[in-house]
Curated annotation (Swiss-Prot):
InterPro entries xref list: PP_M1-like, PP_M1_C, RABV_P-like_C
Residue stretches of biased makeup (Acidic residues): 70-82
Family: Belongs to the lyssavirus protein P family.
Polar residues biased stretches: 143-158
Protein name (Swiss-Prot/TrEMBL): Phosphoprotein
Statement: the UniProt record of this protein carries the keyword Chaperone: yes
Job of this protein: Non catalytic polymerase cofactor and regulatory protein that plays a role in viral transcription and replication. Stabilizes the RNA polymerase L to the N-RNA template and binds the soluble protein N, preventing it from encapsidating non-genomic RNA. Also inhibits host IFN-alpha and IFN-beta signaling by binding and retaining phosphorylated STAT1 in the cytoplasm or by inhibiting the DNA binding of STAT1 in the nucleus.
Length: 303
């Protein structure tokens, strides 16, 4: 047999490539036709148009009548209560949040504490909301108070008469007790704010060392490495568990450096089966206690 013969598999491969090329060309032609569909009509020559064509306007009479009727029905007082898209207060507020967020990230990258950055950030947001967003609401409340002042004065006069008549009754002393119920609410709100700030400081320090590996004693009288990523937990869950470590809340409140190896070992012993299998639990417990004692001693020396 001659060596110039072509193998049948090569012929089949060439036929397949030809078919694919034909399909590709058909697809390209269809795409070109669809993109040039607006050019398939009769051409319009600008020179053939009349001179006054630029002054002509095409209007829909039915739509125009509907809009005119709607404009007549709506009063000017109702139009003042609605803002157009250009006057939406949320757009500049979003821009403000983006700006201060970028500044906060820069401050955190420079090494500034999370507690200080967050307190300054919250003050800026409160100031912006009180000056730019709450102004319209305050105007509405002032107008309502001015309108209701006469009726309020009459009702207050009647109430003063009733109080003067009932002052001599000893059973009415309960009604004149001072409003001390407001104080616990304020204290609880401040306590919640402080707890959120402390948790934020813990989350910041844990997130910075999320992939850093720490040494722990193993069962084989050696050591092994472990980090927060191997816990397979959310940052919020890690922070909640870390708040149970003695002394962590106090150190975070003072803005000091947290015992991260102690926190990692405490959370891992509580939530990771693999860590408990690898680690010598007694030695890890002693290691946690030693870290707590050393960090608390440093905090007392700093105070």
């Amino acid at each position: 047999m001659s060596k110039d013969l072509v193998h049948p598999s090569l012929i089949r491969a060439g036929i397949v490539e030809l078919e694919m090329a034909e399909e590709t060309t058909d697809l390209i032609n269809r795409t070109i036709e669809s993109n040039q569909a607006h050019l398939q009509g009769e051409p319009l020559y600008v020179d053939s148009l009349p001179e006054d064509m630029s002054r002509l306007r095409i209007e829909d009479k039915s739509r125009r009548t509907k809009t005119e009727e709607e404009e007549r029905d709506e009063g000017s007082s109702e139009e003042d209560n609605y803002l157009s898209e250009g006057q939406d207060p949320l757009i500049p507020f979003q821009n403000f949040l983006d700006e201060i967020g970028a500044r906060a990230v820069k401050r955190l990258k420079t090494g500034e504490g999370f507690f200080r950055v967050w307190s300054a950030l919250s003050d800026d947001i409160k100031g912006y909301v009180s000056t730019n967003i709450m102004t319209s609401g305050e105007r509405d409340t002032k107008s309502i108070q001015i309108q209701t002042e006469p009726t309020a004065s009459v009702s207050s006069g009647n109430e003063s008469r009733h109080d003067s008549e009932s002052m001599h009754d000893p059973n009415d002393k309960k009604d004149h007790t001072p409003d001390h119920d407001v104080v616990p609410d304020i204290e609880s709100s401040t306590d919640k704010g402080e707890i959120r700030d402390i948790e934020g400081e813990v989350a910041h320090q844990v997130a910075e060392s999320f992939s850093k590996k720490y040494k722990f004693p193993s069962r084989s009288s050696g050591i092994f490495l472990w980090n927060f990523e191997q816990l397979k937990m959310n940052l919020d869950d890690i922070v909640k568990a870390a708040m149970n470590v003695p002394g962590v809340e106090r150190i975070a409140e003072k803005g000091g450096k947290l015992p991260l190896r102690c926190i990692l070992g405490f959370v891992a012993l509580d939530s990771s089966k693999r860590f408990r299998l690898l680690a010598d639990n007694d030695k890890v417990a002693r290691l946690i206690q030693e870290d707590i004692n050393s960090y608390m001693a440093r905090l007392e020396e700093a105070e």
